[in-house]
Amino acid sequence: MDHLPMPKFGPLAGLRVVFSGIEIAGPFAGQMFAEWGAEVIWIENVAWADTIRVQPNYPQLSRRNLHALSLNIFKDEGREAFLKLMETTDIFIEASKGPAFARRGITDEVLWQHNPKLVIAHLSGFGQYGTEEYTNLPAYNTIAQAFSGYLIQNGDVDQPMPAFPYTADYFSGLTATTAALAALHKARETGKGESIDIAMYEVMLRMGQYFMMDYFNGGEMCPRMSKGKDPYYAGCGLYKCADGYIVMELVGITQIEECFKDIGLAHLLSTPEIPEGTQLIHRIECPYGPLVEEKLDAWLAAHTIAEVKERFAELNIACAKVLTVPELESNPQYVARESITQWQTMDGRTCKGPNIMPKFKNNPGQIWRGMPSHGMDTAAILKNIGYSENDIQELVSKGLAKVED
């Protein structure tokens, strides 16, 4: 198979990935593949472009490195072109409501007739099967968080709160990426493809698993705490200093002993409530948990972030300043690792945003292209799978494809 014009780089060079999906979750999986060197084809509706395009800046990050194909994949010759594309595809990712592709006649079995080795990743809010009440419902970040038990665990003691920005979408996209790569490994070993059913709510169920295990195995549910504190452990979570916020984790025998001396609680050490060798102070089970929080709050409020960081470094207590977004690009760690980078958009503008992650030493990722325009690569992709200029124009004339103006 000849590939589309693009530089060869990254650990996934030579891999062809196709995705159909809008907004964030499914496309984030495609973004990861594209930044790691795969040839990634982004399918958009012919009449209406991906709704993400209305955002002024984010699409330049989320759709960089992609090849844009505008094709009606469910109708007549457009469907035929899509199935022909599948013959040369390694991984196909679709994000929709439940078994939307199967309902429109594109089942796993149809795809495997054209490519027995194809890895298919279905990403939806509630999965490909289940009850009629849920399976076909639309889902976004907050829906998946609410249905999974994740949202109810977060927020303030008086009110739950979803995690932003769009946590469930990103976790689900990463799950699609890793699952598809696992399936590809097996498909190349056996010659038999795989179909993956990724339900966003199940992804978030796993993300919220830590505290849930106490309920499932004893009936006790961890309460939400106020002001960003850890629900279980004192000295862990968000705290306010004289000039801003830090997060800290008071974990370890020596760390607790030295911290207690600083905040005036040394007399509690080696007591029945806080015996020698204590590594964590349980906020609920330890009767002194509230007192530890009170004293720690007072001590931190009397010191600047710089003073706290210096002292905690001496005590080997993990902590970090809560950075504002404007502080990121000047932070020395960000600068040293080039965590924020720049690239050129298709119209020649400079765009700034997060760099590729993670960092591969021997086969690094690369930003080689900005976000393509709607239908920009339709002709090149169709020619790549054997279509002539006349074939392409016929698809366009029937409203089944869109090429760049």
Swiss-Prot record:
One of its GO terms (molecular function) is L-carnitine CoA-transferase activity. The active site is at D169. It catalyses: crotonobetainyl-CoA + (R)-carnitine = crotonobetaine + (R)-carnitinyl-CoA; 4-(trimethylamino)butanoyl-CoA + (R)-carnitine = (R)-carnitinyl-CoA + 4-(trimethylamino)butanoate. Gene3D superfamilies: Crotonobetainyl-coa:carnitine coa-transferase, domain 1 (3.40.50.10540), formyl-coa transferase, domain 3 (3.30.1540.10). Pathway: Amine and polyamine metabolism; carnitine metabolism. It is found in: Cytoplasm. Its main location: cytoplasm. Homodimer. PANTHER family: L-CARNITINE COA-TRANSFERASE, SUCCINYL-COA--D-CITRAMALATE COA-TRANSFERASE. Catalyzes the reversible transfer of the CoA moiety from gamma-butyrobetainyl-CoA to L-carnitine to generate L-carnitinyl-CoA and gamma-butyrobetaine. Is also able to catalyze the reversible transfer of the CoA moiety from gamma-butyrobetainyl-CoA or L-carnitinyl-CoA to crotonobetaine to generate crotonobetainyl-CoA. This is L-carnitine CoA-transferase. It comes from Escherichia coli O139:H28 (strain E24377A / ETEC). The lineage of its organism: Bacteria, Pseudomonadati, Pseudomonadota, Gammaproteobacteria, Enterobacterales.
